[in-house]
């Protein structure tokens, strides 16, 4: 038990280094207000599901884990947010996708952009194009950004992966 606790603390420190946890909480409060309950957990993606989603999205997951945030108000689920990383040109890009209970995207945010170029993918207006998309949407039509081709493609495929993951998770209670 102590070993599991220490592993959780170690992984949490890695994931939430550089103020990432605080930035996510700030994004949640800005979107849903101050009166929401926020719970998060690390979710290990089962290998078969991971492979299936990676093949469909044509992009590998950054790791075998994602962080799932449950945003509730008075025990009513408002949204589920899934945080992951994708590779930019040379550095990871940390992003979070908010979904409603039906799997439609409510919003997408870049939590941490580490590259020297291509930071325009963090622009709120660019990320608005994901709102309303679900697993049946055409993710091939996203706005290009000059100088950010790799980041645009990575974020686009990454968001699609999380939508596919959530659609599968909706059918099970194991992740909650």
Describe the function of each predicted region:
Residues 2-5, 13-94, 101-176:
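Intrinsically disordered terminal and processing segments
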């Amino acid at each position: 038990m102590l070993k599991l606790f220490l592993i959780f603390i170690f992984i949490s420190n890695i994931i939430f280094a550089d103020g990432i946890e605080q930035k996510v909480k700030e994004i949640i409060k800005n979107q849903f207000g101050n009166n929401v309950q926020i719970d998060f957990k690390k979710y290990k993606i089962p290998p078969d599901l991971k492979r299936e989603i990676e093949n469909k999205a044509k992009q590998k997951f950054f790791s075998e884990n994602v962080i799932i945030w449950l945003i509730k108000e008075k025990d009513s689920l408002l949204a589920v947010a899934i945080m992951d990383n994708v590779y930019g040109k040379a550095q990871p890009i940390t992003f979070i996708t908010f979904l409603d209970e039906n799997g439609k995207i409510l919003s997408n945010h870049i939590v941490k952009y580490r590259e020297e170029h291509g930071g325009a993918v963090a622009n709120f207006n660019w990320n608005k194009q994901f709102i309303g998309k679900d697993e049946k949407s055409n993710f091939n039509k996203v706005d290009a950004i000059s100088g950010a081709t790799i980041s645009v493609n990575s974020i686009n495929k990454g968001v699609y992966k999380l939508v596919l993951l959530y659609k599968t998770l909706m059918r099970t209670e194991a992740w909650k």
